[in-house]
Amino acid sequence: MGAYETEKPTKDAAALETQSPEDFDQPSPLRKIISVASIAAGVQFGWALQLSLLTPYVQLLGIPHKWSSLIWLCGPVSGMIVQPIVGFHSDRCRSKFGRRRPFIATGAALVAVAVFLIGYAADFGYKMGDKLEEKVKVRAIGIFALGFWILDVANNTLQGPCRAFLADLAAGDAKRTRVANAFFSFFMAVGNVLGYAAGSYTNLHKMFPFTMTKACDIYCANLKTCFFLSITLLLIVTVTSLWYVNDKQWSPPPRNADDDEKTSSVPLFGEIFGAFKVMKRPMWMLLIVTALNWIAWFPFLLFDTDWMGREVFGGDSDGNERSKKLYSLGVQSGAMGLMFNSIVLGFMSLGVEWIGRKLGGAKRLWGIVNFILAAGLAMTVLVTKFAEDHRKTAGDLAGPSASVKAGALSLFAVLGIPLAITFSTPFALASIFSSCSGAGQGLSLGVLNLAIVIPQMIVSLGGGPFDALFGGGNLPAFIVAAIAAAISGVLALTVLPSPPPDAPKATTMGGFH
């Protein structure tokens, strides 16, 4: 399909609020866009800590395995519900502080509350009656689960308005929109690197000796310390950005009495489903490609360190001491691989715009890197086979050879290339397509988020049972993920419309009819 043609929306087309014309004067200076994008570093620092430190913390609290998946499921569930709602209201917020800033500030405050509950769950549980000798600390688990859910809600409250704010600052300029999302992806990588580095340092708790208590061992103390650093970084970048970058107060466009009556009669989720009803073909294609892309990504994001511990190192979390140690070494190597992945992601994010131009556009770049993702996921089978062959000659508890370990870590690093595109291009295309169709940035990005979280829920619920059907291990899910990545690449190249070089400025629209 050729370049996406702008179609001026009609009154029946619905409708979703966007910026008024006076807010679309010129794109904001790059320094302001970078300032807002830097909030991603604070958000992602906390996410990296979750991945690197919460597993031993969960074991410390004694959360049963059958319930742990439900706790991790809260991310996509809260994303599916919270982000569209936040996007809806941020498109229509009339606060004197602007449309996006109140939500970003609220999200940052909720993150502070959440990490406090998570970090001090063991201490609060002990004060409320948990016994140190008990394996399962019920009260601490309840506090931890509450904090974990609040943290996911807070992150979704932050990220949607941040991306919508970047789209506002780009003022309908397609190139500036792509650059803004590339910087957002870059700062996500910065936050990841900082988080994984902090999580891998076992003596970080010495910065704050008070973090170690009778109920809180070294893992717990390190978690507290890391979260203190995380919230400090998040508050610094958030306060700086919200103070430095102006967010104009929004006023709804004039409507007649019939419009007001119809708008007020439509409930919130009517607006959300209405967005699907009036969505143009480019946005539908974007949702399909994005959903397939995340079916490909999420199994690896969930099981990458487990794959290192189980298939590459040959360990077992439920085996004997030597087997458990091998598994632990594999998980630590996986965390190192994630750091390499984040470093590559960061550098790739800075070059997304230039590389996209050289390859002929954003959709072509996305299609190509999806094939890189498919090849990388398929290579996990080869790395696993080499690791198994080495154990046949060196012994079951020998661990991987240096070449196998290097190959696995290289795989982590290479996958940082497609991940950088996944974190930037779909959001940039959603902003561009919504500007062309007149849809609100916040709600459009919230709808796009559904194409991300629904695949995550499917993988979270079905990944384990699917692997068990084929004898366990992580490879069955990785193979399906590779196939999904290849299909996503084909669709990105064939059915996804090319965005215009410079999208025209959005037109003001009335309420939903």
Curated annotation (Swiss-Prot):
Key words of the record? Membrane, Phosphoprotein, Sugar transport, Symport, Transmembrane, Transmembrane helix, Transport
Task: Give one GO biological process term.
Answer: pollen germination
Tell me where the signal peptide lies: none
Q: What is its main location?
A: membrane
Q: Which Pfam families match?
A: MFS_1 (PF07690)
Locations of Basic and acidic residues compositional bias? 1-11
Which function does this protein serve? Responsible for the transport of sucrose into the cell, with the concomitant uptake of protons (symport system). This transport is both voltage- and energy-dependent. Can also transport other glucosides such as maltose, alpha-phenylglucoside and beta-phenylglucoside. May also transport biotin. Required for normal pollen germination and anthocyanin accumulation induced by sucrose.
Q: What is the effect of changing residue 65 to C?
A: No sucrose transport activity, high instability
Cellular compartments per GO CC:
mitochondrion; plasma membrane; plasmodesma; vacuole
**Reactions catalysed according to its record:** sucrose(out) + H(+)(out) = sucrose(in) + H(+)(in)
Q: Where are the transmembrane segments?
A: 33-53, 68-88, 102-122, 140-160, 179-199, 225-245, 283-303, 335-355, 366-386, 409-429, 442-462, 475-495
Respond yes or no to whether keyword Nucleus is given for this record: no
Q: In which pathway does it act?
A: Glycan biosynthesis; sucrose metabolism
Q: Which residues carry this modification: Phosphoserine?
A: 20
Please name the gene that encodes this protein. SUC1
Topology relative to the lipid bilayer, per the entry, is:
Multi-pass membrane protein
* Name assigned to this protein: Sucrose transport protein SUC1
Q: Which residues lie on this side of the membrane: Cytoplasmic?
A: 1-32, 89-101, 161-178, 246-282, 356-365, 430-441, 496-513
